[in-house]
């Protein structure tokens, strides 16, 4: 397994004073995450993608996660954190033992707290080395990127692709500019967006919001042909580059 035990994937061009911490999707630190880091280097930025599943890679494989997510796909975010509802959903789908173990871990509150702790630690490590730091995340990682902005006031900015917004009561602690990108066919995540946007605007926060029509959750990931949208992904990356130049600068 390529990422078994690896702490992170990093690209640090010589002379870079700005770095983007990249948080992976629910699939783990896979080739697509590494490709995002390579794209960032072409824009002139250093990058570091922590392996947030370190120590759990044998269970949290993309295959196991795919089967696990299929078992709970019809549940809301809140229902997925209800152990009884998750168990009932997996029973209906006759999920495998590995899928059950994977979903049990992914929605375990202590494990999720550990993901945030790992994300924050990764940001701290990078901030000790680089003058300017931005977070960028996709899916699960997008939510972590936004949560980091509520916890670390030294961030230059934070970027989320279809991530779950943080609780509205945490918005007051955000000081960094936010770029929030969504797919319009993403009902579960999008239910939380209006209250999040309202809280950001009411708080006078720096928010750039973009929702792409006729796209699904994960549209930026070109390794997932069932959801990838080339046009939206290309434009979203152009906006990401513009936002990084505005908030982190070219280094």
Regions found by a protein language model. Give the residues of each.
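N-terminal cap/leader regions of alpha/beta-hydrolase-fold enzymes
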Residues: 1-251
